[in-house]
Amino acid sequence: MRGVLIAAMVALVVSLLGTPWVIRLFRRQGYGQEIREDGPSSHLTKRGTPTMGGTVIIVAALAGYFLAHLVTGIGFTASGLLVLMVMTGLGLVGFLDDYIKIRKQRSLGLTARMKFTGQAAVAIVFGLLAVRFKNDAGLLPGSTYISIVRDTSLSVGIIAFPLLAWIIIAATSNAVNLTDGLDGLAAGTSAMVFGAYVIISFWQFGNLCEPHAAEAGCYLVRDPLDVALVAAAAMGACFGFLWWNASPAKIFMGDTGSLALGGAFASIAIVSRTELLLVVLGGLFVIETLSVMIQVAFFKATKKRVFNMAPIHHHFELAEWPETTVIIRFWIVSGLAVAFGLGLFYAEFLSHGGG
């Protein structure tokens, strides 16, 4: 528990104190955000706000994780390092996307094919490595079985597992990317979901199956304490960044941050065996993504729009909701989704005779 607290506090302090330094640096370098011309007119005033703030989130999370290990003397684990690999790798893809936008002074960076390739490369490497590194109990970081709150009996097989990992990682990172359209929305929502994973992973650690004396409801997962430590570091980094990203934002996380956070969620879900539970915990990300899919499909079929604009947070902006009202109400929705997801997690534990 001490390591989890240290990771969260270090990441919070690094992010909180490091972000203003990055804001000044990026302003001097001219790393300002370009704004979509077809977006809400109120967003035009945000043009030039420093972006690529996700670099601070990643660095703060890494600092929290590694310093916590240094202080506690706990060894590194395959699961924790794999999650950080995905977070950093997708952060790099997002950084390239943001950098191209800045250099070419446009709102579009990497081509869809280039971003797809980058996400696929990171995800497939994760998928290949996650089914290696068996520990003394015979557990792997990943599992070929589809998981809800723990593994089900449905397996995709060792060959298809990297493909499954890619689907989960790409879908989640793109969902967070779509949500990152209002000041503080993605950062605040991400902090809540990471907080949920701190609770889930620490609970799994306290209820691990013993090799020869498995208790009712126990969990067969590898390295849950280290996963909790990663989630705590990411949560602290998001909260520290949110201080400066809250409306009116002094800096945006950019694709650097949104892709990294989405990758972290997906990889944590895989190593904690909660792949489908992530759909509930990240309910706001799902709503935002579905709004885009519905808008595109309906427009192609009828040439009419369901929403004023997608993702759905822009719909409410164009309906003349103040931006802060949209953000706070969406945070409430996210909080309810997280609470419901944690309730499902605990109910499943009780249904297996735990408690």
Curated annotation (Swiss-Prot):
InterPro entries: Glycosyl_transferase_4, PNAcMuramoyl-5peptid_Trfase, PNAcMuramoyl-5peptid_Trfase_CS
HAMAP family: MraY
Encoding gene (name): mraY
PROSITE patterns the UniProt entry points to: MRAY_2
Keyword Hydrolase applies: no
Superkingdom in the source lineage: Bacteria
Cofactor(s) recorded in Swiss-Prot or TrEMBL: Mg(2+)
Function summary: Catalyzes the initial step of the lipid cycle reactions in the biosynthesis of the cell wall peptidoglycan: transfers peptidoglycan precursor phospho-MurNAc-pentapeptide from UDP-MurNAc-pentapeptide onto the lipid carrier undecaprenyl phosphate, yielding undecaprenyl-pyrophosphoryl-MurNAc-pentapeptide, known as lipid I.
Chief place of localization: membrane
EC number: 2.7.8.13
Stretches of the chain forming a coiled coil according to its record: none
Pathway per the UniProt entry: Cell wall biogenesis; peptidoglycan biosynthesis
Membrane topology: Multi-pass membrane protein
Protein's recorded name: Phospho-N-acetylmuramoyl-pentapeptide-transferase
UniProt keyword list: Cell cycle, Cell division, Cell membrane, Cell shape, Cell wall biogenesis/degradation, Magnesium, Membrane, Metal-binding, Peptidoglycan synthesis, Transferase, Transmembrane, Transmembrane helix
GO BP terms: cell division; cell wall organization; peptidoglycan biosynthetic process; regulation of cell shape
GO terms under cellular component: plasma membrane
GO molecular function, one term: UDP-N-acetylmuramoyl-L-alanyl-D-glutamyl-meso-2,6-diaminopimelyl-D-alanyl-D-alanine:undecaprenyl-phosphate transferase activity
Pfam families: Glycos_transf_4 (PF00953), MraY_sig1 (PF10555)
CDD domains listed in its UniProt record: GT_MraY
Catalytic activity reported: UDP-N-acetyl-alpha-D-muramoyl-L-alanyl-gamma-D-glutamyl-meso-2,6-diaminopimeloyl-D-alanyl-D-alanine + di-trans,octa-cis-undecaprenyl phosphate = di-trans,octa-cis-undecaprenyl diphospho-N-acetyl-alpha-D-muramoyl-L-alanyl-D-glutamyl-meso-2,6-diaminopimeloyl-D-alanyl-D-alanine + UMP
